[in-house]
Regions:
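Catalytic phosphate-donor-binding core of small-molecule kinases
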Residues: 3-4, 8-102
Length: 102
């Protein structure tokens, strides 16, 4: 939620099962997030002219070099992440507290 919010995306309740595509550093003023079902598959194809050194970065950890015609398939993993909750407050209580100064 924090990364998505800082990129201009929506606030999403943690148990909601959805995929959100949020443009980062978009070149147009009408770029908006798209909210999809977590069951949807997203396919991205590299089209047109690609300059040397184009790549895709995954979670800031690994990357691949891309060429015209390459495709990336994004889908929900079968492996779920278990999150640790450190306080007793609800998501909305925490959100209200964090956004109070805005």
């Amino acid at each position: 939620t924090g990364y998505n919010l800082s990129a201009g995306g929506p606030i999403v309740e943690p148990t909601a099962r959805m995929t959100i595509l949020t443009p980062i550093s978009a070149h147009s003023l009408n770029g908006r997030s798209v909210v999809l079902s977590s069951e949807d598959q997203i396919e991205i194809e590299v089209m047109g002219h690609v300059q040397d050194g184009q790549s895709a970065v995954f979670d800031g950890d690994s990357y691949v070099t891309l060429e015209v015609g390459d495709r990336i398939l994004v889908e929900r993993s079968e492996i779920e992440t278990i999150l640790v909750k450190l306080n007793a407050g609800s998501f909305l209580d925490n959100l209200r507290s964090k956004l109070a100064g805005i």
